[in-house]
């Protein structure tokens, strides 16, 4: 999982599909890791559960594959950790497309719980 060693104690961690998305979020001050694909594996779930955080925010791409990935991650994480997800506005493909800190911050703030 990309970025896992760099996550320090934090309230939440954003989970993205790709490393560029995770780097973009980290650059803007949002702790993030990347799955390196659309779907979380059981091994990745186990790694997520070792992260020093109380919540994960699923920030997967704004396409059908991202929706499938959200569902899979939720099934794997279940009630093991607090899980939420963001709704990326239609005009953006993924979090890296959101160049405004203010917009991205609002999207993350408006996360939804399952």
Regions found by a protein language model. Give the residues of each.
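TOPRIM fold recognition
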Residues: 10-13, 22-114
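Glycine-/acidic-rich phosphate or pyrophosphate-binding loops and their flanking alpha/beta elements
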Residues: 1-11
């Amino acid at each position: 999982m990309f970025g896992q060693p760099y996550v320090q104690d934090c309230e939440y961690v954003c989970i993205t599909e790709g490393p560029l998305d995770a780097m973009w979020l980290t650059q803007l001050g949002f702790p993030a890791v990347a799955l390196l694909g659309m779907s979380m594996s059981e091994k990745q779930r186990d790694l997520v559960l070792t992260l020093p955080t109380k919540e994960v925010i699923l920030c997967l791409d704004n396409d059908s594959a991202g929706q499938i990935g959200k569902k899979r991650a939720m099934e794997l994480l279940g009630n093991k950790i607090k899980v939420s997800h963001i709704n990326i506005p239609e005009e953006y493909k993924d979090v890296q497309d959101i160049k405004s800190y203010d917009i991205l911050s609002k999207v993350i703030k408006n996360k939804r719980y399952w």
